[in-house]
């Protein structure tokens, strides 16, 4: 993706999607390559039912080992208020790093929406279930169908009932080949009640032990080309 082909935030195509969101009274997460300061950014726009853009998020964890080495990384994770629900966004490779969902939880997100486009999905959907569990936050991901791909999914943070009995937190899990519109419904009242009583998320973290998370030092076996861009 070249900078010249990336689009501005006021591009007519974005405006058209906003108009349709208002017309059909639906929320939309729209992704596009947008103009960064010097390079394109992989961005997502959250549009409300009135056709207003609530938030623009640019992907933080760009795939610097592949074509996205020429894409400018976003600098922060963001949360917006959509119809009384706090929404956060992750884009594809963001979900490989637990810090992404953790920061969104700390910023107040109740649901994380994940726009995705990759294969080898089985370990990745299990990781999303874990992100929901450990942050007490709902997670939903959309991924294009295809061999070894697909698996659009949604997970509730509710993993056990009041008696401590485990419950399946899978709300939706598509197969890899089926193409379609998938619906996932979260019981926000139940989720909020669960978050108010259980002991995960930001309840008993020991942040004084976490300073190493901010170090930029990389040692073997994790040294790769294109790091610390």
Predicted features and spans:
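Metal-dependent catalytic neighborhoods of phosphoester/phosphodiester hydrolases
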Residues: 1-10, 40
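Short capping/connector residues at structural and topological boundaries
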Residues: 6-8, 62-67, 82-85, 102, ...
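CN hydrolase (nitrilase-like) catalytic-core segments centered on the catalytic cysteine
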Residues: 6-29, 96-183
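Glycine-rich, aromatic-flanked loop segments that form ligand/cofactor-binding clefts
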Residues: 25, 33-36
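A cross-domain feature marking catalytic cores of carbohydrate-active enzymes
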Residues: 32, 91, 143
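Active-site catalytic loop in hydrolytic enzyme cores
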Residues: 19, 35-107, 116, 120-130, ...
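A short, structure-level motif marking secondary-structure boundaries and short turns
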Residues: 2-3, 85-86, 112-114
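C-terminal beta-strand edge segments of enzyme domains
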Residues: 79, 144-229
């Amino acid at each position: 993706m070249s900078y010249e082909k990336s689009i501005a935030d006021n591009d007519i195509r974005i405006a058209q999607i906003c108009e349709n969101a208002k017309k059909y009274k639906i929320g939309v997460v729209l992704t596009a390559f947008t103009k960064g300061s010097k390079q394109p950014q992989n961005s997502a726009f959250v549009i409300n039912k009135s056709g207003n853009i609530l938030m623009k998020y640019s992907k933080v964890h760009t795939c610097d080992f592949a074509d996205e080495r020429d894409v400018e990384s976003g600098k922060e994770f963001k949360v917006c208020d959509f119809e009384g629900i706090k929404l956060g966004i992750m884009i594809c490779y963001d979900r490989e790093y637990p810090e992404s969902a953790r920061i969104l939880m700390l910023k107040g997100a109740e649901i994380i929406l994940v726009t995705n486009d990759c294969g080898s999905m089985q370990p990745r959907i299990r990781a999303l279930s874990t992100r929901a569990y450990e942050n007490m936050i709902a997670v939903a991901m959309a991924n294009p169908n295809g061999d070894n791909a697909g698996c659009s999914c949604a997970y509730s943070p509710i993993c056990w009932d009041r008696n401590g009995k485990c419950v399946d937190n899978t709300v939706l899990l598509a197969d890899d080949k089926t193409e379609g519109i998938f619906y996932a419904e979260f019981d926000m009242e139940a989720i909020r009640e669960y978050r108010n009583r259980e002991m995960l998320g930001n309840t008993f973290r020991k942040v004084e032990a976490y300073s190493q998370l901010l170090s930029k030092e990389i040692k073997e076996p994790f040294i790769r080309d294109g790091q610390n861009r």
